[in-house]
């Protein structure tokens, strides 16, 4: 390994990105678009990109636009539903579509490799849940983002919308659904590779696969660049040192241990709660072809957000697939290919109490996970039959999904389980990490714009970067939720370039 006196200047980069998933790939693409001269290094512990949570079969949900995911509009004490989170997620997904459209327009991205249209449907079948869905529909329908949402309780129409859900169902059972035709499925594994390949081929991005971060330390010696991070990598050829003024930790569940290792004070506020997942995957191609929508149901009480049950049309490696789940479970690993010691190794004096407080105050979640762990194959099949009454056990196989690490955050009120994602950045903006899970990938562009705002603020405010950003995201300084004309303009452009229909 190189030491200070013999440090090779070629091993100094403008940015080191850890984890070759959709987040780091999006950040690499944005940074290169804003400054083609930046030297960027991507480090990945596995042998190829997008093998953890970004992979199509590992992702808990794809194409999240809050059209059908009922957990983004929770019921409130007065009987109405909260809509702010749904609007924010929808706006973020429109921003992703806008970015992909710009790259597609220039011929720099083939969106047909990862983006497919699939209707987004919410379906429920108990009086209580139907009342909830009706309230949700009545409120969202009034918002520009969801104005084209449709409602139905008509058996024949519902059969057209979701034939597998309605086939064999008791005609006396009340069923209601909402539908948005302009929904999508996104293969984020394919998108990750589509971002990275041209950057690698052009020499704008250096990649180290089969390599992990062994040490991460801020350099403050007088004879060195003041702002640099010293990153020691351990790969097939041993250890080596690289340096950079900026480090991004986008390694999914692996981001928390690296954030803790960085020593920045902001890391002390966080702990992680890992949740694993399982899918039932349909092996009958004819059945998969009949289902042309994502059908989301209502989550059980206490269920984490990545465990909302759905019958999911999903493209995996270019092939239409049909999945049901995900069923939640528990593993102390922070990554699917991680270590059982990940959770205990993350415990610190600063986060032990918040973790215990979350365990004591989230009994419903703990009980839910225990019940999920106890599920037999028969019970999982019965859950599938609630969605698809004619489902046969022999047509479905069990597949392990990706690992999620929910955020536990220390606050004045004690530890709390925080849903969603959060960017944690050092005070000087030299290091950022992304923690959390759903909706994640679908909002990657918005999340990485936040990283740029917090870590590259001076350059982001420059005329050069603003002009380039405006070219990539024409509506970047406008709010589509507040101005329906802006939303319509965004959607018309994206739909034309991406081949989406309303």
UniProtKB/Swiss-Prot annotation:
Keywords: FAD, Flavoprotein, Oxidoreductase, Tricarboxylic acid cycle
Pfam families named among the record's database cross-references: Mqo
Classification via InterPro entries: FAD/NAD-bd_sf (IPR036188), MQO (IPR006231)
Gene3D superfamilies linked: D-Amino Acid Oxidase, subunit A, domain 2, FAD/NAD(P)-binding domain
GO BP annotation list: tricarboxylic acid cycle
Reactions catalysed, as given in the entry: (S)-malate + a quinone = a quinol + oxaloacetate
Required cofactor names: FAD
Source taxon at top rank: Bacteria
SUPFAM superfamilies: FAD/NAD(P)-binding domain
Pathway as given in its UniProt record: Carbohydrate metabolism; tricarboxylic acid cycle; oxaloacetate from (S)-malate (quinone route): step 1/1
EC number: 1.1.5.4
GO molecular function per UniProt: 2-hydroxyglutarate dehydrogenase activity; L-malate dehydrogenase (quinone) activity
Family from the record: Belongs to the MQO family.
Protein name: Probable malate:quinone oxidoreductase
Organism lineage string: Bacteria, Bacillati, Cyanobacteriota, Cyanophyceae, Synechococcales
């Amino acid at each position: 390994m190189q030491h200070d006196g013999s440090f090779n200047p070629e091993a100094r980069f403008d940015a080191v990105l850890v984890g070759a998933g959709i987040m780091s790939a999006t950040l690499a693409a944005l940074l290169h678009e804003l400054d083609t001269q930046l030297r960027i290094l991507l480090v990945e512990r596995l042998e190829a990109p997008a093998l953890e949570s970004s992979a199509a079969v590992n992702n808990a949900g794809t194409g999240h636009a809050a059209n059908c995911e009922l957990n983004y509009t929770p019921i409130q004490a007065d009987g109405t539903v909260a809509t702010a989170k749904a609007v924010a997620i929808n706006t973020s997904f429109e921003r992703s579509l806008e970015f992909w459209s710009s790259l597609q327009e220039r011929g720099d991205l083939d969106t047909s490799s990862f983006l497919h249209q699939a209707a987004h449907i919410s379906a429920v079948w108990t009086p209580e849940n139907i009342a909830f869905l009706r309230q949700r529909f009545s409120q969202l329908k009034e918002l520009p983002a969801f104005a084209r949402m449709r409602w139905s309780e008509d058996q024949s129409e519902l059969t057209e919308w979701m034939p597998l859900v309605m086939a064999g169902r008791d005609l006396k059972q009340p069923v209601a659904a909402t539908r948005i035709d302009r929904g999508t499925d996104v293969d984020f594994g394919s998108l990750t590779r589509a971002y990275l390949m041209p950057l690698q081929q052009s020499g704008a991005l250096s990649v180290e696969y089969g390599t992990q971060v062994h040490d991460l330390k801020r350099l403050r010696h007088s004879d060195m660049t003041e702002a640099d991070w010293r990153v020691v990598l351990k790969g097939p050829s041993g250890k080596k040192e690289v340096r950079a003024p900026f480090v991004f930790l986008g390694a999914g569940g692996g981001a928390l241990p690296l954030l803790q290792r960085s020593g920045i004070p902001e890391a002390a506020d966080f702990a992680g709660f890992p949740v694993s997942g399982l899918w039932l995957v349909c092996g009958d191609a004819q059945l998969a072809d009949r289902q042309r929508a994502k059908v989301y149901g209502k989550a059980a009480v206490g269920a984490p957000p990545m465990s909302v049950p759905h019958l999911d049309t999903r493209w995996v490696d270019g092939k239409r697939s049909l999945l049901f789940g995900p069923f939640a479970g528990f593993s102390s690993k922070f990554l699917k290919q991680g270590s059982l010691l990940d959770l205990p190794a993350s415990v610190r004096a600063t986060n032990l109490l918040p973790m215990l407080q979350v365990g004591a105050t989230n009994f419903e979640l703990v009980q839910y996970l225990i019940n999920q762990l106890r599920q037999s194959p028969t019970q999982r099949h019965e859950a599938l039959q609630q969605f698809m009454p004619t489902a046969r056990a022999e047509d479905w196989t069990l597949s392990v999904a990706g690992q999620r690490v929910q955020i536990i955050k220390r606050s004045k009120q004690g530890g709390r389980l925080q849903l969603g994602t959060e960017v944690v950045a050092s005070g000087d903006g030299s290091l950022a990490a992304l923690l959390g899970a759903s909706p994640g990938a679908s909002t990657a562009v918005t999340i990485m714009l936040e990283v740029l705002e917090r870590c590259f603020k001076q350059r982001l405010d420059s005329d050069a970067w603003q002009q380039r950003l405006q070219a990539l995201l024409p509506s970047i300084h406008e709010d589509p939720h507040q101005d329906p004309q802006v939303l319509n303009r965004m959607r018309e452009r994206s739909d034309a370039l991406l081949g989406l229909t309303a």
